[in-house]
């Protein structure tokens, strides 16, 4: 006879019961009407709802080591704190069933057939058998190898907490200690990071934005990088930083009394000279553009161009040759050039813009019969269409433009070119009024502005410079500045 018994092939009409997701296998054949007739391997079964706290026959406790009963093979029974948890349906079956301590032959064959590496570490002869407590609190040592066919597989997905609620027994003390430690660690993390909480989907979501992640470390890094304020003690008005919040509060009281506010930013000051210097250095350090209609200043030509368009919306321009009306001077000029080019040339000659007498510009338009072209004799422009040559002369040689510079008299057909031209006059110098936002490129214009705009509130004028003062005492204190120079 061989050392190992011959393996018996299992035949069944239900192969799915041999999968790893099945329950616990049968333990005895003598009970009919409760268990299935098939034999299942307990070694290959996954039991996610059973949490083992196995101490491997821990005899360290002298009080309980000698009181525990022993089995026929010399294995000690486990105490209540060492017992394992099994599903409640199995407990209800086992409470009303009497089992024999002898191991049936079917179970031996089943144990021999289980040779999977997954089950090798779960149940061996050296391990203690699973202990199941009945309602009478008597430890009965049995090996659980069977499960009822009526057992619901969904019960396997229940957590260990729900299994504890189903049983009338108190949970083991060791399990309570483990849960307390995990809860304590979670509370500590939530206290440190109150905004980081896992939602129902298992994702950690930031309460300050839409960011979410399944990792706590990613959300923690996101909060530090995106929402943690490192410059909390910085003044919003003057951008000055302070070491404490109390110093920032004391500093903020100074800005409540600031009478001078920059219209281009949030800068405030109690000294007007500081405001004037701030405007010149910050907003008009390189270029200065101002509107001649309302004296509003801009730091770029594009801003001035947009500002001019606002003025053009309020005004309506009427064509003098027809009833065309528009709010944009460029649109009016384009209309006159395209529709009334010949009449515009005649008007230019009458005003002497051409410089060669009446109809001088019209006489410059000739027709080349050899090449069948209309040619401009002023610049050589040519085209097969007479209207194209008339449009060219009206645009380039009539010197009638929608925008004309007041300083040099040069005209421009587009507002953007006109705004860029204003930069050429800034080389002579920029003169800013120290008492308001007025600026000009001519020193005489600034003097006239000071005499008319600030003579009432600042009647005392310095004879050596353009400074004005509200009282005579301030003027006297200012005069030593010129004596030292």
From Swiss-Prot:
Task: Indicate whether S-adenosyl-L-methionine appears among the record's keywords.
Answer: no
- Localized where? Nucleus
Q: Where is this cross-link: Glycyl lysine isopeptide (Lys-Gly) (interchain with G-Cter in SUMO2)?
A: 76, 177, 181, 226
Question: Where are the stretches annotated Interaction with CTNNA2?
Answer: 371-455
Q: Name one Pfam family in it.
A: zf-C2H2
Name the Gene Ontology biological process terms: negative regulation by host of viral transcription; negative regulation of DNA-templated transcription; positive regulation by host of viral transcription; positive regulation of cell growth; positive regulation of transcription by RNA polymerase II; regulation of transcription by RNA polymerase II; symbiont entry into host cell
Instruction: Spell out the residue ranges making up region: Disordered.
Output: 1-23, 54-82
User: InterPro entries recorded for this chain?
Assistant: Znf_C2H2_sf (IPR036236), Znf_C2H2_type (IPR013087)
Q: What is its main location?
A: nucleus
Q: Describe the family membership recorded for this protein in Swiss-Prot or TrEMBL.
A: Belongs to the krueppel C2H2-type zinc-finger protein family.
Task: From the Swiss-Prot or TrEMBL record, give the protein name.
Answer: Zinc finger protein 639
């Amino acid at each position: 006879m061989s050392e190992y018994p011959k393996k018996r092939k299992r035949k069944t009409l239900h192969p799915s019961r041999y999968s790893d997701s099945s329950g616990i296998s049968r333990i005895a054949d003598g009970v009919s009407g409760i268990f299935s007739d098939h034999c299942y391997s307990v070694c290959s079964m996954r039991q996610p709802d059973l949490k083992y706290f196995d101490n491997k026959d821990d005899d360290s406790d002298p009080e309980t080591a000698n009181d525990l009963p022993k089995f026929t093979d010399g294995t000690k029974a486990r105490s209540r704190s060492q017992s394992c948890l099994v599903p409640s349906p199995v407990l209800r079956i086992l409470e009303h069933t009497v089992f024999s301590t002898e191991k049936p032959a079917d179970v031996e064959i089943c144990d021999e057939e289980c040779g999977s590496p997954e089950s090798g570490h779960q149940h061996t002869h050296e391990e203690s058998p699973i202990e199941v407590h009945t309602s009478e609190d008597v430890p009965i040592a049995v090996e659980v190898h069977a499960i009822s066919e009526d057992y619901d597989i969904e019960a396997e997905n229940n957590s260990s907490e729900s299994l504890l609620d189903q049983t009338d027994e108190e949970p083991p003390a060791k399990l309570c200690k483990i849960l307390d430690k995990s809860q304590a660690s979670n509370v500590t993390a939530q206290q440190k990071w109150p905004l980081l909480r896992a939602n129902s989907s298992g994702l950690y979501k930031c309460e300050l934005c839409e960011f979410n992640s399944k990792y706590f470390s990613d959300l923690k890094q996101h909060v530090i990088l995106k929402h943690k304020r490192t410059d909390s003690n910085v003044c919003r008005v003057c951008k000055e930083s302070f070491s404490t919040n109390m110093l920032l509060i004391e500093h903020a009281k100074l800005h409540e009394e600031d009478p001078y506010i920059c219209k281009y930013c949030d800068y405030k000051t109690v000294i007007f000279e500081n405001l004037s210097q701030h405007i010149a250095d910050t907003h008009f350090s390189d270029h200065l553009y101002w509107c001649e209609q309302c004296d509003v200043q801009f730091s770029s030509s594009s801003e001035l161009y947009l500002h001019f368009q606002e003025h053009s919306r309020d005004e309506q321009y009427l064509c003098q040759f027809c009833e065309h009306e528009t709010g944009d001077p460029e649109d009016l000029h384009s209309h006159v050039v395209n529709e009334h080019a010949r009449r515009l040339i005649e008007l230019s000659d009458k005003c002497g813009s051409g410089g060669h007498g009446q109809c001088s510009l019209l006489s410059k338009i000739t027709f080349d019969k050899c090449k069948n072209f209309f040619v401009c004799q002023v610049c050589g422009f040519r085209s097969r269409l007479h209207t194209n040559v008339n449009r060219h002369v009206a645009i380039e040689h009539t010197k009638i433009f929608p925008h004309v510079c007041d300083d040099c008299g040069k005209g421009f057909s587009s507002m953007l070119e006109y705004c860029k031209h204003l930069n050429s006059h800034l080389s002579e110098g920029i003169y800013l009024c120290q008492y308001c936002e007025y600026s000009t490129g001519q020193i005489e214009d600034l003097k006239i502005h000071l005499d008319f705009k600030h003579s009432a509130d600042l009647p005392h004028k310095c004879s050596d410079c353009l400074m004005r003062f509200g009282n005579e005492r301030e003027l006297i204190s200012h005069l030593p500045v010129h004596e030292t120079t």
